[in-house]
């Protein structure tokens, strides 16, 4: 089989050449990749072998002003701009596409910068609030510890005061005061003095009952004993006489309450009066 003459003649088909040139120039697709190469250069779409053509400064300024007014490109507006600037409608469309891509990129950059600044501010505020929170928590913990210490001290003081109150002086009915102590001491002294008095009166009692005094008594004790013997003996005889007269009466009451014979009261004091006279 013979190949077609057009394929072996060394000249490619116009459609293939145009696609290759389009892919080489980077304008086959609209995107972020071609925005740097098409900022001020446009490719003529009429012939497959035509080269790039740089836009003039006036054309770029006119396109910028039109883009600032409206970034959307309609067919009537595209044809009018191409006619006014001496460009192809395809050139105007590609320039607007690339310009919108750059505008969106810059807009995203501005939004990102604003959001980044807001994030940094919020992060600083968050850190400050966290530090304040930690400080407040530490202060609350310290206050709770201090309050617990005060409550423990108060409870300890109350518990300490209760035994102190129970250990206080007892009531008057159950305890002893200074007067009671002195009374007890006086009783002890009196109890100590009682045997001495008993010992001193023992010879007298013995003399009164007719018993001889102790062998160890002195001369003074013997004289006092004899004097006391005479005194008690005289009184004892007088009492015996009165008692005999009181009990010898024949009446039931012994004549003590009789109207006819009152008791001779003058006889009680007759002897001392006669002695004094």
UniProtKB/Swiss-Prot annotation:
Q: Which InterPro entries match?
A: HD, HDZip_class_I_plant, Homeobox_CS, Homeodomain-like_sf, HTH_motif, Leu_zip_homeo
Function description = Probable transcription activator that binds to the DNA sequence 5'-CAAT[AT]ATTG-3'. May be involved in the regulation of gibberellin signaling.
Q: How does it assemble?
A: Homodimer. May form a heterodimer with HOX5.
Molecular function, one GO term = sequence-specific DNA binding
Region feature (Disordered): 1-35, 154-180, 250-277
Q: Which gene encodes it?
A: HOX4
Coiled-coil spans in chain: none
Q: SUPFAM superfamilies, from UniProt? A: Homeodomain-like
Which residues form the DNA-binding region?
A: 48-107
**Residue spans with biased composition (Gly residues)?**
1-13
Question: What is any one GO biological process for this UniProt entry?
Answer: positive regulation of DNA-templated transcription
Question: What name does this protein carry?
Answer: Homeobox-leucine zipper protein HOX4
List the source organism: Oryza sativa subsp. japonica (Rice)
């Amino acid at each position: 089989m013979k190949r077609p003459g057009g394929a072996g003649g060394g000249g490619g088909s116009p459609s293939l050449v145009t696609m290759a040139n389009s892919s080489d120039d980077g304008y086959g697709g609209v995107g972020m990749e071609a925005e740097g190469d098409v900022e001020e250069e446009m490719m003529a779409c009429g012939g497959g072998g035509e080269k790039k053509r740089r836009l003039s400064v006036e054309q770029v300024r006119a396109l910028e002003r039109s883009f600032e007014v409206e970034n959307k490109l309609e067919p009537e507006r595209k044809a009018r701009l191409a006619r006014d600037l001496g460009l192809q409608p395809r050139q105007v469309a590609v320039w607007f596409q690339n310009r919108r891509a750059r505008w969106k990129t810059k807009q995203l950059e501005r939004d990102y910068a604003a959001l980044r600044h807001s994030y940094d501010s919020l992060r600083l505020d968050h850190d400050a609030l966290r530090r304040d929170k930690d400080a407040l928590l530490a202060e609350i913990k310290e206050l709770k510890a201090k309050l617990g210490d005060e409550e423990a001290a108060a409870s300890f003081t109350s518990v300490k005061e209760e035994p102190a109150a129970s250990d206080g002086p007892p009531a008057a009915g159950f305890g002893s005061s200074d007067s009671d102590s002195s009374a007890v001491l006086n009783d002890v002294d009196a109890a100590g003095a009682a045997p001495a008095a008993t010992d001193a009166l023992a010879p007298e009692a013995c003399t009164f009952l007719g018993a001889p005094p102790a062998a160890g008594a002195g001369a003074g004790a013997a004289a006092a004993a004899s004097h006391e013997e005479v005194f008690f003996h005289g009184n004892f005889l007088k009492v015996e006489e009165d008692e005999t007269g009181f009990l010898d009466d024949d009446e039931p009451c012994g004549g003590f309450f009789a109207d006819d014979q009152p008791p001779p009261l003058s006889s009680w004091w007759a002897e001392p009066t006669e002695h004094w006279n």
